[in-house]
Amino acid sequence: MTEFESAPAYQEAKYLTSAAEFDQLPPDQGAEIAFIGRSNAGKSSALNIITGIKGLARTSKTPGRTQMINFFALNEHERLVDLPGYGYAKVPRMVQKRWEELVDSYLKKRRCLKGLVVVMDIRHPLKEVDEDVIEWAVNYDIPIHILLTKSDKLSQNAAKKTLGEVQTAISAYGEKLTLQLFSSHDRTGLDEVKAVLSQWFSSEP
């Protein structure tokens, strides 16, 4: 089967379920790719553009609105997963701790997880919480792809400069981490991220 033939139809994505606790997750079968990022980094917008379905993942001007793990089925066996946003100071610490425990359990125990897309606003990349999430995923041997979102907010030269700086910062992790520029506004990097997702989905268990 060719890569094209095996690529999921992202436009077929449909909301499946949400989970506030680990035991509420759907069966650990098939293949999942999860998206995670700081609140308002553009995670929901990225999911909407990748699938071509406006409003699939709810966007909000209020950071911290996504408080559960949301699952979107591409077909019977493949899913995209929207993990809770992090790093929003106005969310009570108790709530943040619950999110952290839920996400940690998901990353550590979810056997069908094929890869993690870490979404960062290109104007504020690699905050301490971003680095913590990357360390999490690296420790659990999860492939990581970084989206530097909102690249349209910077000039082309400035965006490339930031891309290079982040590449240098993550180089110690080796081939487990890849990154790219992305913009939900002008669709920069859309084909590139879809290619990464499709490669992960087609990888052996």
Swiss-Prot record:
User: What name does UniProt use for this protein?
Assistant: Probable GTP-binding protein EngB
Cross-referenced Pfam families: MMR_HSR1 (PF01926)
Q: Which gene encodes it?
A: engB
Please provide the record's keywords in A-Z order: Cell cycle, Cell division, GTP-binding, Magnesium, Metal-binding, Nucleotide-binding, Septation
Higher taxonomy: Bacteria, Pseudomonadati, Pseudomonadota, Gammaproteobacteria, Legionellales
**What positions does the entry give for Mg(2+) binding?**
44, 66
Q: Which PANTHER family match?
A: ENGB-TYPE G DOMAIN-CONTAINING PROTEIN (PTHR11649:SF13), MSS1/TRME-RELATED GTP-BINDING PROTEIN (PTHR11649)
The cofactor named in the record is: Mg(2+)
A cellular-component GO term for this protein: cytosol
Q: Name one GO biological process term.
A: division septum assembly
Keyword match GTP-binding: yes
- Classification via InterPro entries: G_ENGB_dom, GTP-bd, GTP-bd_ribosome_bio_YsxC, P-loop_NTPase
Which protein family is named in the record? Belongs to the TRAFAC class TrmE-Era-EngA-EngB-Septin-like GTPase superfamily. EngB GTPase family.
State the protein's purpose. Answer: Necessary for normal cell division and for the maintenance of normal septation.
Source organism, top-level taxon: Bacteria
Task: Detail which positions bind GTP.
Answer: 37-44, 64-68, 82-85, 149-152, 182-184
